[in-house]
Amino acid sequence: MLKVVPSIDISEGKAVKRIRGVKGSGLILGNPVKIAYEIYEEGYDYLHVVDLDSAEENGNNEEYVKDICKIGFKWVQVGGGIRNVEKAERLLDYDCSAIVISTLPIKDPKSFMDIQKIIGKDKILLSVDYDSSGYVLIRGWKEKSIKVLDFLLSYDSLGYIFTYVENEGTKRGIDNNVKNYVIRIKGLKEYAGGIGSIEDLYKLNEYGINYAIIGMSFYSGSLRGIKYVY
């Protein structure tokens, strides 16, 4: 079974949906807490939240994250700019279910290991933001780092979120190569980037993905209302 997880990206106090991560592109949706509550009222019990400003080291939106975590979702995973133990613990104190980390293991392995040691691997999801060349992208998807497979072999966590950045926010379809990555790992397997149709969801389920994170296809209505595929 594949579970569908709506996403909320927050920038400057507003829920947004960017295209390929480019600031100013895509949709401005409004108050993120209101959007989250609407999602909850529609019967979704899992949510993916990203603080874009914190990720870009240009402020933070923690007050909205805190309020979203109080709504009543069974599971809220939060990412964006988590670079130290203090922030990781603070987010967990807000009752978020897990934190999402991407750049830190590559740029500052010691800080990552400190976080892992204190809060535990079972509270950390690693986001593998990658391109068609098979490299992990960091620093706002502007810098290539290491090969995806090298990354997967280097770290352990609750699970991995595979984000295919070239199709993020486009609804152009998934990256079928993700099936070659998920077979290498244990734990939760999540995917984001380009999901635009029910066929994409069926493929991801076939590949062994547990959660499909949807943004543009949710807010544009093409996949809104779908919660599972089998």
Curated annotation (Swiss-Prot):
One of its GO terms (biological process) is L-tryptophan biosynthetic process. Pfam families: His_biosynth (PF00977). Pathway: Amino-acid biosynthesis; L-histidine biosynthesis; L-histidine from 5-phospho-alpha-D-ribose 1-diphosphate: step 4/9. Its EC number is 5.3.1.16. The keyword Amino-acid biosynthesis applies. Keywords: Amino-acid biosynthesis, Cytoplasm, Histidine biosynthesis, Isomerase. GO terms for molecular function: 1-(5-phosphoribosyl)-5-[(5-phosphoribosylamino)methylideneamino]imidazole-4-carboxamide isomerase activity. Belongs to the HisA/HisF family. NCBIfam families: PRK13586.1. This is 1-(5-phosphoribosyl)-5-[(5-phosphoribosylamino)methylideneamino] imidazole-4-carboxamide isomerase. It comes from Sulfurisphaera tokodaii (strain DSM 16993 / JCM 10545 / NBRC 100140 / 7) (Sulfolobus tokodaii).
